[in-house]
Structures are given as C-alpha cells and as structure tokens.
Amino acid sequence: PVVDLDQNYHNPITNVRTFGDDLQTVIDMGKAYIKAAEEEGVATSVKHFPGDGVDERDQHLLTSVNSLSCEEWDATYGKIYEEMIEAGTLTVMAAHIAMPAYEEYFDGKPCEKIIPATLSKNLMIHLLREKLGFNGLITTDATPMVGFCSASDRATAVPLSIENGCDVFLFNRNMEEDYRFMTEGYEKGILSEARLKEAVKRILA
C-alpha cells in the first residue's frame, strides 16, 4: 500500500495515489490493506519510505526531498511506518527521496548532498532498521527512475544501494549491465561480502 501523506496537493504522485492527507486515515487504511492481503496469503510492501507528498516534484524525474524536521517526520511519516511495521508488513519500499533532516541528525553535521533513501545508510540502516526496528526485506523503488542516479553514476549506485541497506532491486535498466555493475562493485569493495550475504538471507527468508 501507498502510505504517503498528501501534504502538497501539487505533488503529481501523492495527489492521486494515497489514502489522503489525514494521518489516522492513512494508518487505518494501510493496516486494513496489510490485514486483508495477509488473509489472502499475499505479502505487502509499504511505500515510499521515508515518505512522499511533501515535495511537489516527481521522483521519477529527479531525487525529490522530504523536507520535514526530524520531529515533524516522527509525528507523521515515522508514526505511519511504526504502525505498518507493528501491523506486520513484510517489506518496505525505499524511495528515491532524500531526507536532509535525518541525514544531519545521524551525521552530526549539515547535509551537503541530496542522497536518495535508496542509497542512504542513514535512512535505511540507522532510521528504518535501528530506530524503527524493521527487520524485513527492503526493496528499492524502480531503479530506471532518474531519481535513483542523481547522486552518483549507475555503476556506483547499483552496488551501493545494497551495501547501504536495500536487499533487492525493483527492475533493472539492462540486466547484463546491472549484473556487471554489481560484480564490479563487489570486486572494488563498494559492496561488502557481509552485506551481500545479509541481503541474500533476507531474500531467502
């Protein structure tokens, strides 16, 4: 389910794909979706972490930004993801959306670069895994989207997304090329053996 909040009616994604702009409605509908899917034996993936709907831009075309403060995020999107995790979602989809406030919080210094969540260790590991306690599978949003590679070239982004916390890709651009990027990233040390094994274990689980 799309558990974004439609905070900016100019946003071309959330103004037609969310349960609305009311926090409790989004939580209730998201939990109902997870429950119904579970009853039918279907795994759910909640998206788009860390949350779309603040920016008015489209992450298909660039890396958009969730510009909320940590406190604002905790009270809105953070609350939603806490509830979805508690409700039993098995996967979370990471978005090509940056969140400078939590980058600064975890780094202890001003955020100097816009980094999509799909490439951010701070957002995937420190926020989603450690702070929110999610232990399921993390998947990227579609990697051919422009927002995925706005912070680095694709040869780096492909292995880096796994190294920094995602477990599986959604779509490739070119299967052979992306496989080569992954193997070369492993050989160059961009992707560690420990992280690769962890991702494989989560996929198999």
Question: How should these model regions be labeled?
Answer:
Residues 21-184, 188, 194:
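Second-shell residues forming the walls of enzyme active-site clefts
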Residues 3-13:
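Short, conserved phosphate-binding/catalytic loop or strand-edge motifs used
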Residues 187-205:
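Mid-to-C-terminal alpha-helical segments outside catalytic/metal-binding sites
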Residues 1-3, 47:
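Proteins with a high burden of low-complexity, intrinsically disordered sequence enriched in S/T/G/P/A and R
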Residues 18:
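Conserved beta-strand positions that form and line the central face of beta-propeller blades
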